[in-house]
Amino acid sequence: MNILDQLDAKSLRDDVPDFRPGDTLNVHVNIVEGNRSRVQVFKGFVMGRQGSGVRETFTVRKVSFGVGVERTFPVHSPIIDKIELVSRGDVRRAKLYYMRDRHGKAARIREKRESSASSK
């Protein structure tokens, strides 16, 4: 293991939940305005994940006042306070770029139903 791999391993976060494209997330982001810092929540669905390791990013999309807003976050960034998984989505694609062209009911993502082994 070389020096760069060791530095990358130190920078990885261990509190990242297991999320996939289609899942709905609350991303708590630290915003610095002048000398004050506050936490802003960005809620939307995951459009995709790119990269691996320290350089891994994910894109979250939401519709705010009729305007689609997409934001790309580094997974292991220190500006992210925490990531909450709200619900799981049932999709068949790794990248949900087709959702940009959908409006209204067509823009909905089915919720994934968890199968329980104890119900048999």
From Swiss-Prot:
This protein is located at the 30S-50S ribosomal subunit interface and may play a role in the structure and function of the aminoacyl-tRNA binding site. One of its GO terms (biological process) is translation. The keyword 4Fe-4S does not apply. SUPFAM superfamilies: Translation proteins SH3-like domain. GO terms for cellular component: cytosolic large ribosomal subunit. The gene is rplS. It comes from the Bacteria. Keywords: Ribonucleoprotein, Ribosomal protein. GO terms for molecular function: structural constituent of ribosome. The keyword Cytoplasm does not apply. Signal peptide: none annotated. Belongs to the bacterial ribosomal protein bL19 family. This is Large ribosomal subunit protein bL19. PROSITE patterns: RIBOSOMAL_L19 (PS01015). InterPro entries: Ribosomal_bL19, Ribosomal_bL19_CS, Ribosomal_bL19_sf, Translation_prot_SH3-like_sf.
